[in-house]
Amino acid sequence: MTMLETKTDPMVISMGPHHPSMHGVLRLIVTLDGENVIDCEPVLGYLHRGMEKIAENRTIVQYLPYVTRWDYLATMFTEAITVNAPERLANIEVPKRASYIRVIMLELSRIASHLLWLGPFMADIGAQTPFFYIFREREMIYDLFEAATGMRMMHNYFRIGGVAADLPYGWVDKCLDFCDYFLPKVDEYERLITNNPIFLKRVKDIGKISKEDAINWGLSGPMLRASGVKWDLRKVDNYECYDELDWSIQWQSDGDCLARYQVRIGEMRESIKIIQQALKAIPGGPYENLEARRLSKGRKSEWNNFEYQFIGKKPSPTFKMPKQEHYVRVEAPKGELGVFLIGDDNVFPWRWKIRAPGFINVQILPQLVQGMKLADIMTILGSIDIIMGEVDR
């Protein structure tokens, strides 16, 4: 029974868009009764840049540098989906070597993304030490990216029919050394974090999502797998060469913040397993499909004359997309990243719809925080792992 003297009116406060724990420019309008959350309304759109409309006024080759600005912490995945869509639409074959290189880059990007989720998530809860540890390992991944692509973050490495450049001399050995170094570090994170009583108090049984809710809300990625659903597009769709490698889906059944943390820690270990196998089994051959890079009139040209030598090495600016539609998806670190592409027998896509995992996953936030304490909002929002670049697009 509530005593009338102590009963207070609900208080409406605005968290963000500049609050450090909002992970970007997210704004939450929170209704509080004391310290208990009655209601929460996310306000999106502060980082909207019209990415879908830009795509409809650019060729795919011109659009490639833009896509790394969606999820700017896992840029390889946005590039992968951008080249996979026209490849599937036009039935362009990717050489085996290029496929293996892509898988290695994607998994390195997954580890980098999970590391940069883990550090700020722990800092939100109040643990500062892991925040500095994860930057040490993440820097090594960025060094590998810089050696292979020339860029630390916005790589612009994937191309229609392959990748931009082959792996440089000595890169494979360097990457294997990193894998051997990184696995014990994951154990170190676990020793430091998992059984810490303060950490467990903050995350156990907080923000629980049932299996049915996870499916009904359309959640994907670690959010879905932490609720007891063994669903990973790398196993389901078998894109690139994932079906040739031996690895297992990481999942938990509790559906709380702790389960989501455990899934991501497990995924980092599995990613290392995938990278090690791919590096050892990487075949020789071309790293791109040159046929995909010739101009449409170039198909009629001789293979060795001046015209081919001049234009055959450049990405084709007049690659026309057939008049059909296609939905392509990849398993990004945050969930299912998809693109619905409609071609119109033109160099520009007629429609380019982005299915951003963060946008779908953040919709369940109001349901999760109702009845919780104000401090739990940081924990729950952090465990969802959103990047506003892809939420607002």
Swiss-Prot record:
EC number of this enzyme: 7.1.1.-
Catalytic activity: a plastoquinone + NADH + (n+1) H(+)(in) = a plastoquinol + NAD(+) + n H(+)(out); a plastoquinone + NADPH + (n+1) H(+)(in) = a plastoquinol + NADP(+) + n H(+)(out)
Alphabetized PROSITE patterns for the sequence: COMPLEX1_49K (PS00535)
Membrane topology: Peripheral membrane protein
MF (Gene Ontology): NAD binding; oxidoreductase activity, acting on NAD(P)H, quinone or similar compound as acceptor; quinone binding
UniProt-annotated location(s): Plastid, Chloroplast thylakoid membrane
Sorted UniProt keywords: Chloroplast, Membrane, NAD, NADP, Plastid, Plastoquinone, Quinone, Thylakoid, Translocase, Transport
Main function: NDH shuttles electrons from NAD(P)H:plastoquinone, via FMN and iron-sulfur (Fe-S) centers, to quinones in the photosynthetic chain and possibly in a chloroplast respiratory chain. The immediate electron acceptor for the enzyme in this species is believed to be plastoquinone. Couples the redox reaction to proton translocation, and thus conserves the redox energy in a proton gradient.
Subunit description: NDH is composed of at least 16 different subunits, 5 of which are encoded in the nucleus.
Protein known as: NAD(P)H-quinone oxidoreductase subunit H, chloroplastic
Organism: Chlorokybus atmophyticus
Gene that this sequence comes from: ndhH
